[in-house]
């Protein structure tokens, strides 16, 4: 078998609908567009959400809420992630988290949460640590340094 001999599996493809090829084809003359009108013209049709002049649903609904421009967005990691990627006695900071592939970019900081178990003594230097995560890190013999 050669590359030019490859064909799709039998029945997996469908022939395209050929429009405007005579009345006998079933899709000749008006090509499935009916007679005249906006939708029969080239580039015809209405934009999404247009309801014929009636006030659209998107404008009938009230506005709600706002975007807090001071909101901080943290990269969230769990204790189990640290267990998997770090050796005993390691220092966990931005650079080391980046090196082991746990973070790609730092948004407003890093927060450690307490899901999973930790058996290694790690020194954790991040922006935020949950109470359960801090307890697990200290119980394993590590230190928490919140920056």
From Swiss-Prot:
Task of the protein: Binds to the 23S rRNA.
Biased composition (Gly residues): 21-31, 42-52
GO biological process, one term: translation
UniProt name for this protein: Large ribosomal subunit protein uL15
Record's keyword annotation contains Ligase: no
Cross-referenced PROSITE patterns: RIBOSOMAL_L15
GO CC annotations on file: cytosolic large ribosomal subunit
UniProtKB keywords: Ribonucleoprotein, Ribosomal protein, RNA-binding, rRNA-binding
Keyword Ribosomal protein: yes
Self-association state and partner proteins as the record states: Part of the 50S ribosomal subunit.
Region (Disordered): 1-62
Family according to the record: Belongs to the universal ribosomal protein uL15 family.
Name of encoding gene: rplO
Pfam families registered for this protein in UniProt: Ribosomal_L27A
Gene Ontology molecular function: any one: rRNA binding
PANTHER family: 50S RIBOSOMAL PROTEIN L15, LARGE RIBOSOMAL SUBUNIT PROTEIN UL15M
């Amino acid at each position: 078998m050669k590359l030019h001999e490859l064909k799709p599996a039998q029945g997996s493809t469908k022939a395209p609908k050929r429009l405007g090829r005579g009345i006998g084809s079933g899709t000749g003359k008006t090509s499935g567009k009916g007679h005249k009108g906006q939708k029969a013209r080239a580039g015809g049709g209405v934009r999404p959400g247009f309801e014929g002049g009636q006030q659209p649903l998107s404008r009938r609904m009230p506005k709600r809420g706002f975007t807090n421009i001071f909101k901080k967005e943290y990269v969230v990691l769990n204790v189990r992630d640290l267990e998997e990627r770090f050796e005993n006695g390691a220092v966990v900071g931005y650079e080391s988290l980046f090196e082991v592939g746990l973070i790609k970019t730092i948004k407003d900081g890093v927060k450690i949460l307490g899901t999973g178990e930790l058996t290694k003594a790690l020194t954790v230097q991040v922006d935020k640590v949950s109470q359960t995560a801090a307890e697990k890190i200290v119980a394993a013999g590590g230190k928490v340094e919140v920056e």
